[in-house]
Amino acid sequence: MKTLDGVQILLKSGYGLCHISNFSDELKQALKNHLTRICHGETHSRSGYAMYRYKPTVEAFLERYEKKPAKTQKGMIGEFLSHIIINELLDNFETASPFFNLEEKSIKKGFDLLLYSTSDHKVWITEVKSGELRKGKDVNETSQLLLSTAYNDLKTRLNENEINHWANAMNAASIAISQHRNYKDVVLD
C-alpha cells in the first residue's frame, strides 16, 4: 500500500481508520494537487473555467468553512481529508462525489462520500467521523465511539424514507463522473 507522510491508515473489512499525526509537506502538496477536483468534481475541475481554479476554490472553501461552529469545521476537515487520503492511498477506490454542496454554500446533507470501487465496480456509501480525543477516553475508546456513530448514522440514513438523501447522492455522483459512462450506470442502477 502507498504511504503519505504523517498519515497512518488501518483498513478492515467494511471500514478504514485513519490517524493524521502530522500535517506534513507531502500532505499539504496532496491537498493542493487535489483541491479543485475534490471540491467541484472531476468534470468541473478540468473545465478550465476561472471559478474552478485553485485560488477561487480556496476562497469558496474558506467562505463555507469560516462561518461554521468548531464541531462542524472538524467534520468538514475530516471529510475533506478523507477525499485526499482516498485519492492518494487507496488505488482501488475513486471518490465519485464532490465536496461542495451545489445547492447552497453549506455542508452536504445525507451521505458524506460516494466511492467507486475499481476492483468490483460497486459504489460505496461512506460516512466520515472526525474529532478530538473525548474527555475521559483514550484514543481507542474515542475511535470506537466515532465508528459507532458513523455506523448508526449510516444505518439510519439507509433505512429512512428521506428520498432527498438518495437523490442528492445520485446527482452528485452523476455530475462528478459524467465522463465515465460505466460509473454512471453503476450509480444510477
List where the protein language model places each region.
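Short beta-strand or tight-loop elements
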Residues: 109-111
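Amphipathic alpha-helical segments that form well-ordered structural scaffolds
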Residues: 80-89
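A short acidic/basic microdomain associated with nuclease active sites
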Residues: 89-106
